[in-house]
Amino acid sequence: MNLKSLSLQELEAALAPLSPSPAAVRKVFAAVFAHGAQSVEDVASARQVPRRVGDHLRAHAEMPKLAIVERRRADDGFVKYLFDSPLGGRIEAVRIPIFDEKYVICVSSQVGCALACDFCMTGKLGFKRNLQTWEILDQVLQVREEADRPVRGVVFMGMGEPLLNYKETLRAADILRHPAGFSIAGEAITFSTAGHVPAIRRYVREGHPYRLAFSVTSAIAEKRAKVLPIEKTHPLPELIAAIREYSEVRRERAMIAYVAISGFNMGREDAEALKVAFEGIRIKVDLIDVTDPTGKYLPPTPEELSAFRDHLQILKSPVARRYSGGKEIGAACGTLAATQYGGTVMPRPAEAPPSTTP
């Protein structure tokens, strides 16, 4: 049994033949996730783990591990990790500093991505496979192990569309939130979605405590389709209806991620389209400068951004500019594509064309 993949309830079921106390099972679970045990032996020999349970774990349990291939540190404190999985493929995670107090970890949910958003490097890899629960959690375990501050949040904004790996990402989030696991608050765990409407509606029905961030980028369908091909499958009216349902059921503002692209979606007509699309829906808008290493898309100039923020006042909704850090190490939104994948080496920052996406 893979100790990094089991919920507390699943662990209880797996150990039931040994008749351990609930406290003993919880101790095993906490040793893996709360305390970051490095091996089965560390778990088996943990205090308050009965000998018969420890012996059973030594004989039947495993704790696979991602291999850290590379770490890159940026001047702004962001750290990008490149992992090699024993199941195949390479994935990336980012440690994000929040002032001098804590970290948030950005994790990947898939190797590659099927959605092919035009400004996203991961989409250029194509879809390889979904990550398993343990592969998602091991990103957090290993990044946390090297952290000098507490980890207080996890965002599923790395490689892949988390709602297309629905079961595994939700299982991982539940363990992240569990008080005997990582003990991260539900509202501090966010899934970013490009707009897979059936999964969004399922998520709302099931009532999960985690937040969704909706990548809209343009409320003009023709523009959105140019950069987000999912628009052709799940068009804006369908997505906006799902966002309305999300906001109303949860009684909170929906987070609208808006990738700001110079000369593309920064005009008055773009702000007016947002107003029409989200009329009567409680939202907050996150503006994220595009970071496209190919140079095809450029971030807005300060003048463009200032003018657009003025235009957005018609929304009468909160608007914030999200800092997308780690640009020089390929850690910014949209640049996670695995430095090396299948023998192909992605350009290093010094070699890359002008930067920019999310």
Swiss-Prot record:
GO biological process: rRNA base methylation; tRNA methylation
Binding residue positions for [4Fe-4S] cluster: 113, 117, 120
Chief location category: cytoplasm
Active-site residue numbers: 92 (proton acceptor), 333 (s-methylcysteine intermediate)
This protein's GO CC annotations: cytoplasm
Location of this chain's protein in the cell: Cytoplasm
Annotated disulfide bonds: 106-333
Protein name: Probable RNA methyltransferase MXAN_6459
Species in which this protein is naturally found: Myxococcus xanthus (strain DK1622)
Higher taxonomy: Bacteria, Pseudomonadati, Myxococcota, Myxococcia, Myxococcales
